[in-house]
Each structure stands twice: as C-alpha cells, then as structure tokens.
Design a protein with these regions (language model features):
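Conserved SAM-binding site of S-adenosyl-L-methionine-dependent methyltransferases, i.e.
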Residues: 194
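S-adenosyl-L-methionine-dependent methyltransferase catalytic module, highlighting the catalytic core
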Residues: 187-189, 198-207, 216-297
Length: 298
C-alpha cells in the first residue's frame, strides 16, 4: 500500500479496527508512518495506542473490565435486583446452564470430553461460569475449575454455582501455571479469551503447562471476515478501550496450531447482527472458530 495515499491507508486501518483487529490496524498505520510521516498517521496511531493501555499491566486490565461491568450494571437498573433474586432461588443458574448446553461451541466441547474422558478440567476465562456449570451439571464425575480475570464475574459465578464439582477463582489465563501444579488437567478450554490477551503465546504456554501430556486444549475465538462496500467512518471503541485487540483467520490458526497433535478446527456460523456495524460492511464469514489439539507426550 502506498503510504503517500493517506486516505486509502486510513480506510484500511479503519477496516481492521471494525474487525476488532486493533494490533493489525496499528501495524498498518505505523508501517505507513515510517514511509511517509504524515501527521494524520501520528494522530491515529496515538489514539489506537490509547485503546490498548489497559494491557500495560494486570491491574490496568482488571480495572478496565470492572469499569465496563460497573457501567453495565448502572444501565441495567432494577433488572440487576431481579437478577440477584433469581440467583438466590437458583432460577438463573438453571437458565444459564440450559442455554450454554445448547450452544454449538459447547457441543464441540462435549465431543472433546467424549474423546478425552477427563477427570479434571480447567476453564481458563470462565466469565459468569455458564460453560463450567453446564459441563459440571452434565458430567457429575468431573472436577471443573474456573479461572476468571474479572472479580465481579468470579463473584457472580460463585453465587450462581449449585454444583459441588465446580469451583471458581479470580485470576488470569496467562498465569494458570501459578495456580495449579504442572500436568493437573486432562482437558483445558478457553472460550472467547485469546482475542483479549496481550500475548497469545504466553497464554498458551501457561495453559499447556497445567495440561497433562496427551491432554487436550480447546479454544474458541471470533470469526470476523467482512467486506467493505462503501466508505468506512471513523472508529471509537464502545467501552473506551479495545476489549478485543486481535482477530484470527483460518489460515493463521492452521499455521500456528495445525502442526500440533490431533489438530481440529471447526467453523461455527453465527448470526449477523444488522445495525451492530455501519452499513458499509457486510459479512463474508461470521461466527467463531473452535480449535483443539493434544499436548505432546501422551
């Protein structure tokens, strides 16, 4: 791309921003800026970097997540009280478990359970605990441990939990090797996490450390393949920071994880939400990737 064609470069960067490929957009701008130091590049690069400052430290990341939930709770108003009442009587737990068990990503996870026959499972990035509780409810002989970065989410998961074989703690997917002994788990899964983290390789290394030889790691990441059919407007992240900072393509996933033992990749179609993105976009492939493989040594 010609760095002197500033408008075209900025359009290309905006395309990546709306795909939530923040690092990719920054790379486009920094490369163009190196070849043509236009002030518009400098301004956009500064803005993009400001959306990634929550990744500068673990504390900043937790603070950003908590602020996001604080704003959400404020908007929910009285619905939050209703939610807490449903928690106390267990109705929300049943609804959450039933809903998660119907998800196609969960059904792919069930195939991994059938394949591995695990005794101990780790959910690295457990959110409000729906997947872990659904797994624990359907497999009472399993022990499922959930690790969640948000203290609020971890607290909600503990309040919702009605299953003695499921537990939750606050922590980081990048640091699970600090919480559990090496080789502790037969199966580890991580749904909608790797698109958030600063360093994918670091996170995967931590997860593989607590996975026994021959155990399997399964993860889900968004599949956002879009087409621009008109001029792309300026972009500002909804939460004031880049909650998702990267996207994965099928080619990248196969290059990175395809050489692993018993690699499996499944495309899970999703529902395109009209109005969520500007009208200049239309989907090519939209949904998620389910990826799994076995750790060497088993």
């Amino acid at each position: 791309m010609d760095p002197h064609d500033v408008d075209a470069v900025i359009q290309s960067a905006r395309f990546e921003l709306y795909r939530e490929n923040i690092y990719g957009a920054l790379e486009i701008i920094e490369t163009a800026q190196a070849g043509h130091p236009d002030p518009r590049y400098a301004e956009l690069a500064t803005r993009i970097r400001s959306w990634l400052t929550h990744l500068d430290s673990r504390e900043a990341y937790v603070a950003a997540q908590e602020e996001q939930y604080r704003r959400l709770r404020w908007r929910m108003g009285l619905k939050l009280l209703e939610k807490r009442i449903r928690m106390l009587i267990g109705r929300k737990t049943r609804k959450l478990v039933d809903r998660r068990a119907r998800d196609p990503e969960f059904q792919e996870l069930e195939r991994e359970v059938d394949r591995v026959r695990p005794r101990r499972v780790l959910d690295a990035g457990s959110g409000e605990g729906g997947v872990a509780m659904a797994l624990g409810a359907r497999h009472p002989d399993l022990r499922v441990e959930g690790v969640e970065v948000s203290p609020t989410n971890a607290k909600i998961a503990r309040q919702l939990n009605r299953f003695g074989n499921v537990g939750f703690r606050q922590g980081f997917a990048e640091e699970v090797h600090l919480y559990f002994p090496a080789g502790s788990f037969d199966l580890v899964y991580s749904f909608a996490v790797l698109e958030h983290v600063r360093d994918v390789a670091e996170t995967v290394r931590s997860i593989e450390t607590v996975l026994r030889p021959g155990g399997r790691f399964a993860f889900v990441v968004p599949m956002h393949e879009l087409r621009a059919i008109g001029p792309i407007p300026d972009y500002t992240p909804i939460h004031g920071y880049a909650d998702h900072c990267r996207v994965f393509t099928e080619k990248e996933l196969r290059q990175t994880f395809g050489p692993r033992k018993d690699f499996r990749l499944v495309k899970v179609p999703g529902a395109w939400k009209h109005g969520e993105l500007p009208a200049c976009f239309e989907p090519i492939e939209f949904g998620s990737f389910f990826v799994s493989y076995a750790k060497d040594g088993g």
